[in-house]
Each structure stands twice: as C-alpha cells, then as structure tokens.
From Swiss-Prot:
Molecular function via GO: electron transfer activity; FMN binding; iron ion binding; nitric oxide reductase activity
Species this chain originates from: Enterobacter sp. (strain 638)
Gene name in the database record: norV
Residue ranges constituting the Flavodoxin-like domain according to the UniProt record: 254-393
Name this polypeptide is given: Anaerobic nitric oxide reductase flavorubredoxin
Family: In the N-terminal section; belongs to the zinc metallo-hydrolase group 3 family.
Lineage: Bacteria, Pseudomonadati, Pseudomonadota, Gammaproteobacteria, Enterobacterales
Amino acid sequence: MSILVKNNIHWVGQRDWEVRDFHGTEYKTLRGSSYNSYLIREGKNVLIDTVDHKFSREFVQNLRSEIDLDAIDYIIINHAEEDHAGALTELMSYIPNTPIYCTTNAIDSINGHHHHPEWNFHTVKTGDSLDIGNGKQLIFVETPMLHWPDSMMTYMTGDAVLFSNDAFGQHYCDERLFNDEVDQTELFEQCQRYYANILTPFSRLVTPKITEILGFNLPVDMIATSHGVVWRENPTQIVELYLKWAADYQEDRITLFYDTMSNNTRMMADAIAQGINEVDPNVAVKIFNVARSDKNEILTNVFRSKGVLVGTSTMNNVMMPKIAGLVEEMTGLRFRNKRASAFGSHGWSGGAVDRLSTRLQDAGFEMSMSLKAKWRPDVDALEICRQHGREIARQWALAPLPEASVKPTQQQENCACAAAATADLGPCMQCSVCQWVYDPALGEPLQDVAPGTPWSDVPDNFLCPECSLGKDVFDVLATEAK
C-alpha cells in the first residue's frame, strides 16, 4: 500500500503498531512507530530509505506492487541504522547494481550491518545534488551526529520537500500520515519525548545545523520524516520547537524521582513536594517511583524541568540499581541549565546519598544541598523534609516569590489540631506506617467522614488515605501525646 505525499512522491513505508521497545529496551514506544520510506517517480525513479529489517520481505513485496524493482534508478540512504536501511539486503538481492547514494560514514555503517562492500555506493556531501528529471533535483545536507555520524537530509527542489531523516520525527503510529490529521496533544507529546530521549545529547549541534539549512534559502512546503507524521500544515512549527528545545530548555517545573525499599524515601519525596508547593504553588511538581514508572516519561520530565530531586535508599552502601541506571542515562543525555538535589533514607549506615550527589554533579547538574534521614522519618524528620522543599522552591524560583504564597507550616497545622482537641473533638491521630494525620476538625470527606468527627466516631472500616491500612495502625499524634 502507498500513500500520496505530494505530486509524484508516495509513502511506501511500514507501520509498526506493536513495537514497544526501541534501541534495545532504552526507549519505550508506547504508541508504536512507523518506518517511513518514500518513492519518487519523476524522470528518474528514486527510493529514499527502506524500513526496519524485520519487515524486509513485506516491504519488498509491497514495493513490487508499486513499481518494477528494475525501474528504480537510485536509492538514497539518509541513515544506515537498521530501522532505516534494514531492508537493503532483501531489496538489493533483486537489484544488486542499483546505485546507493549516502555519506562516506554511511558506507561503513551499511557494510557493518549488511556485509556487502560490492554494492554500488556513491558518496555525497553537503551541497551535492542529483538530477532526477523534470527540472527537479535532490540536494544533500550532511547532519553528522543528528544522531549518528552517517546522518544526512535530502531536499527535493520543485516540490520543496525536506526528507529530514530522524530530525523532527516521533515514534508514533497512526493510520493517518499527515500532522494536521492526527491528535495534536498526542503528536506534540511524542515529539518532545522523542527529542528529550534521543536528540538532547546533540542539542549543541541542532541550532547551527538548522541555521545552515535555512541559510540555503530553500522553501520548505513539507517535512517528510523517517518516523511518525509528515509535516504538511505549517511544517516549520516543528523546526521552531527544535530551536527552542535546543536552547537549554526548561519550564517552571520540578521533577522528583526515587526508588525505595521500605517506603521511607517515598515519604521524604512526598514531604519535600509538599514543602515546594507551600512556597511556590505555581510551579509544576511531578513525582515518580522509578520501579513503577515509564523511564522515558521520567527523562522527558527532567528535560522539561528547571531542577530535579533524586531519592534513593541505601543498599550495600550504594544507591539503588534503578536510580544508578537512570542517573547514568541522564549523564549520557547531557541535560543543561538544570539544578539537582539528592535525598534518601538509610539504616545503620549510609553512603548512597553522597554517592548520588557526586554522580549528579558529574552529570552536569548545578547541585543544591542534599538531605538524609535515618530509618523511617518521624514527624520531626518529615517537617525537615518539608523545610528542604521550601528552601528548594526559593532557591530554584525563576522569579521572586511573594511572601503571601507561603502556606501554614506543619507546626501551625499541629496547633490547629491542638485547638481541635480543646474543642472536645479529641486528639489528632497519626498513621504509624506512613505518618498521615487525621484531624477531627477536617474529617476525611473522601470516605464520608464529616468535619468535626472525633476519632472514636470514625467508622471501623476507615482506611488511611496514604497507605490504605486500617484504624488499628493509628496512634495519638506525638505532639499531643507528650
């Protein structure tokens, strides 16, 4: 099956609805992907890229239904990775002498994958062109390390289509091909996820390369990517986003992620987030447990954030393995213009938080003070965590924060509980597992416990909203039990 892109250009690629892992297991393709190949039929017939190797036979079979393979005059390989050039071996078994146009580095990559040095390679560099008849040309632009050394883009004159390789793409599968046809929220989420997890390390190269391409003063009516949609409506919108993302991008957002053995570090994360929100209710705060969250979503949020707090329990004097792995990935992604702080709980001996702080600093983050707790944090320790969050909010604020935005402290809230006790509602009760506090003056509306309900009148089937345990794990709040 083919889809008309424009005039004599057709999409002859492959949709992959089922793929969930890309680059090994490093990128979760939660919405599938597509491998975009394009057939140009002008005075010369040109094939731009192929598809992933696992679809080789299907690709060649579908291509044969579109064109006699012997009629293909040129093959353009913009990128030698297997999801782009994977079907070459199958295709070349039918047309072994067809010229392949690619960069010098691509020959090494193609031979490394396919082991056919006898193929008819023709190397190109930036500014080279290929006449394809009917007054049209293909112009080549090398884009090394966006994101492989062999990468290039191909521009078609006349139709003003830029075949952009991996740039401006998304791992996003849809039966509809064009950007104006698909769900816009999904599309831009996947664009940002793709940039954050794949292209961020090369941000320093993105702006000068885009500037170089724009310097050719060539009109761009469409951008035909290697994955995801073809940009036909306002195609330069994605170019503008790339320029924005490449410029040390950050939003007014803070990301916390952690791993925990006994929920102690989770309690710290929750309290830190509360403190941040007390001081700066306008900042977006996102919390992730790495054991239960999509790694690429975490990294996308780090990319969007002005700062990140990373938490870990101590195990064998070092950080938890999932945290160590994620910090290693952040090191490779080379995030810039971001701050960081480490936190975590330990038992008889620590070590993980200091190690984590060093690793975050080595990864290029501007470090703030770290925070440690021993064993399960009690009321006082959780207040220290909230205070840490308040300080982080002030230090990381993008603009001065008004004093009026500060909420009551935990001590003030405890005073409110004491006032409730004097009003004959009885004491506040604290969950001994997660430290959540039941205040009789407030009740718990989500479980139909009305404000003003003393603990003795709370139904026996009441569950702690934080840890879902019953009334038997609650004790009188420590400040009232003294």
